[in-house]
Amino acid sequence: MAEIKNYTLNFGPQHPAAHGVLRLVLELDGEVIQRADPHIGLLHRATEKLAENKTFIQSVPYMDRLDYVSMMVNEHGYVLAIEKLLGIAVPERAQYIRVLFDEITRVLNHLMWIGAHALDVGAMAVFLYAFREREDLMDVYEAVSGARMHAAYYRPGGVYRDLPDAMPQYKASKIRNEKALAKMNEARSGSVLDFIDDFFTRFPKCIDEYETLLTDNRIWKQRLVGIGVVSPERALQMGLTGPMLRGSGIAWDLRKKQPYEVYDRMDFDVPVGVNGDCYDRYLVRVEEMRQSVRIAKQCIEWLRKNPGPVMTDNHKVAPPSRVGMKTNMEDLIHHFKLFTEGFHVPEGEAYAAVEHPKGEFGIYLVSDGANKPYRLKIRAPGFAHLASLDEMARGHMIADAVTIIGTQDIVFGEIDR
């Protein structure tokens, strides 16, 4: 009798649907996946080790480069861990700004996810729509920090600076006439907060557009319904978090269960799935974008009414004002010490977790009392998700592997670290 031999296929790392540098070794029986073996490490940059040789504040930009689609949320986990060890209080206004930018980042992440996921499955229009909205949010990043992606905006003790009073405007060029320019700058005549408010006022209609294209689309449902099903029990056993866990019907959200900053004052709902398949995870993330709009609106309302400091006044941790440095010798010394030596963190260890767009992003920080971390451990949500890929893909077709990678919302910056 003829021997049945499985076929081995290398999927990636040069594959457009591999989301970066994923290499999957697929064992196939015809076109059915028997085993999926993810090979990682192609984007390993030793972030945890590099952080041990940098002062606490110098490692903030490294956080942006972990999950390079959800920049500020990575920073948030890191600064929370430092603040726990230092035992410092963050001004209320800074907390609201952080929550606002966490939600802006969540929308940025989910727009990238819905665009890339739809493109992988074969729907191109959504990708173009999503990037149209992302552009506005990238401009907000740029307005507050000077960078479109790697913002380094959060600081231990607060944020780098308050929201600017003026939103940068588009300038005239050869490709834009005055009419087009006026339309583009329509929402940019006020402050950054006005621009964010305007964006979140019109954004729900944009979400409706994506849903019109996908939610009841017959082809979209055929590609997602019943694919990559994870039961609630298995989701917990495999360490899934975020939309991957909520898609399986478990209402676990750190913003509700272990509130940090001012999330306990926010009024929002936690969407959960029923069937635990790719379609439910899609619905959960779309609803998350709608909830982010609610949270952002509440933050904007509070920020308008309550001006105030956005950085702690402890000059051992935060730089003094430039005005003070010109007249006060002590301020100048503090500034010099802070940017040469950094600040010393008391001996101890702390774990801080935030509800990252992809799941639970945790930072475990060990300090030996020096000006650098003794050990920094990053708990990346995508790592556990990728580990579950084999189980989710078994028995499905090769084309479904693409759908499953898309639904996991994998970014290799955080997985390989």
UniProtKB/Swiss-Prot annotation:
Superkingdom, taxonomy of origin: Bacteria
GO cellular component entries: plasma membrane
A single GO molecular function term of this UniProt record: NADH:ubiquinone reductase (non-electrogenic) activity
Topology in the lipid bilayer: Peripheral membrane protein
Cellular compartments annotated: Cell inner membrane
Enzyme nomenclature, EC number: 7.1.1.-
Keywords for this protein: Cell inner membrane, Cell membrane, Membrane, NAD, Quinone, Translocase, Transport, Ubiquinone
InterPro entries per UniProt: NADH_Q_OxRdtase_suD, NADH_UbQ_OxRdtase_49kDa_CS, NDH1_su_D/H, NiFe-Hase_large
Main location: membrane
Catalytic activity annotation: a quinone + NADH + 5 H(+)(in) = a quinol + NAD(+) + 4 H(+)(out)
General function of this protein: NDH-1 shuttles electrons from NADH, via FMN and iron-sulfur (Fe-S) centers, to quinones in the respiratory chain. The immediate electron acceptor for the enzyme in this species is believed to be ubiquinone. Couples the redox reaction to proton translocation (for every two electrons transferred, four hydrogen ions are translocated across the cytoplasmic membrane), and thus conserves the redox energy in a proton gradient.
Similarity annotation: Belongs to the complex I 49 kDa subunit family.
Quaternary structure, from the entry: NDH-1 is composed of 14 different subunits. Subunits NuoB, C, D, E, F, and G constitute the peripheral sector of the complex.
Name listed for the protein in its UniProt record: NADH-quinone oxidoreductase subunit D
Source organism per UniProt: Burkholderia multivorans (strain ATCC 17616 / 249)
